[in-house]
Swiss-Prot record:
Keywords: Ribonucleoprotein, Ribosomal protein, RNA-binding, rRNA-binding. This is Large ribosomal subunit protein uL24. One of two assembly initiator proteins, it binds directly to the 5'-end of the 23S rRNA, where it nucleates assembly of the 50S subunit. InterPro entries: KOW (IPR005824), Rib_uL2_dom2 (IPR014722), Ribosomal_uL24 (IPR003256), Ribosomal_uL24_CS (IPR005825), Ribosomal_uL24_KOW (IPR041988), Translation_prot_SH3-like_sf (IPR008991). The lineage of its organism: Bacteria, Pseudomonadati, Pseudomonadota, Alphaproteobacteria, Rhodobacterales. Part of the 50S ribosomal subunit. The gene is rplX. SMART domains: KOW.
Amino acid sequence: MAAKLKKGDRVVVLAGKDKGKQGEITSVMPKDNKAVVEGVNIAIRHAKQTPTSQGGRIAKAMPIDLSNLALLDANGKATRVGFRFEGEKKVRYAKTTGDVI
């Protein structure tokens, strides 16, 4: 099945502690049905100091389930994603506006 959300898409969080936050998808894990969104679902990781890197508390964006994300349309509102054929090509489009993504 084709991916409704892809790397680089602007999304909004629908549920959880970060509900309402917006960000850009930095990576998608289709097998786990999760995505990492910039600035969302941040966890603090404690890193030990090494000769090459400084130790301390490091903020890291953790994966969030794809069902808790919605794509932002041109108006900045959450939308569902649909697929249609334009000529020979299958394209994604925003269900609220009908615009091709």
